[in-house]
């Protein structure tokens, strides 16, 4: 059976993929600056004699052509960029700079290279083509740039996986509908009237107004939104003042809105703006409200969900495949591709409680159980095989 062959190849290449992951992990590069990562990817593809082209600067798009060409093509994607976080893990392959793969993109690149090794080995049995997209700048919405370079031309379906620390390594999760939230960001500038800290009565204190705005924002989700609809409004930055005895002129709050559709995000943004303007007016302050559109929600295609479930069960067993009813409220620019083609976004378990590998994404102690690398490589390979056979 093909799944037996896939798992056997993944096991054989396991140490090779771990080595690649550790090399990438120790040299994390920020969005659109993934030069060393891109070079490593190309070197590994060259070893396999897999054709590829450059996309979006540091990105790479490889193609594996099956012998039995049905005319169908599935694209598998991994993101490449790191975050500006100082790593606190004590690992032999710890980051050597001030950046960190705290979102697991080092693992994503590694397991997609593992997938390339597997599929290249069995390409005589592929009933179509597989494209492998190593995408730069996910943290900065890199898919917007990539998609303009026609990477989806000739592609019929898409799939990807993301490190998920709350799921144990060796298991995966598949969302039944929405996998990742739609997003936006906002910035509130409260304009008061500065003065001496001893004379607040002669000032319009923007810090006091900012506190009132912050408190009012906490009422949006609990009092303005249907409790069965997932919505998050978070203020993540609150800045004002530079001196101990001067009431400043302005206060700036920054944050994000998350919901299961961009329409809901826009609705919540309007509620937020009305609250901000009303509170500021009540305190005699002026304000500026600025928002920037974020990504759309990641919505899994129904047919791809079922295909992914069946493929995962072949590789992992039914007991290690979790169907998830509620979305994660994080965002992902894979949504851009899924607006164009049917796709599947999977949560790849990377946690291991016994090894204390349970820190969340974007944490300076985030790590993975490297067992997940062969799991993901096998799963993505099986998914590609099954898609090309079925459709």
Give the ranges of each region predicted by the language model.
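Divalent metal-coordination and catalytic microenvironments
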Residues: 24, 62, 76, 105, ...
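Acidic/His- and Gly-rich active-site-bordering loop/insert found
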Residues: 2-101, 106, 110-126
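Hydrophobic face of alpha-helices
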Residues: 17-21, 38-42, 112, 207, ...
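Short acidic loop-to-helix transition motifs that present clustered carboxylates
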Residues: 55-61, 139, 328-331
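Histidine/acidic-residue-rich, glycine-tolerant segments that coordinate divalent metal ions
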Residues: 83-85, 90-100, 107, 122-248, ...
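Non-cysteine beta-strand/loop elements that form the S-adenosyl-L-methionine
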Residues: 75-77, 186, 345-350
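Metal-dependent amide/peptide-bond hydrolase catalytic core
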Residues: 211-391
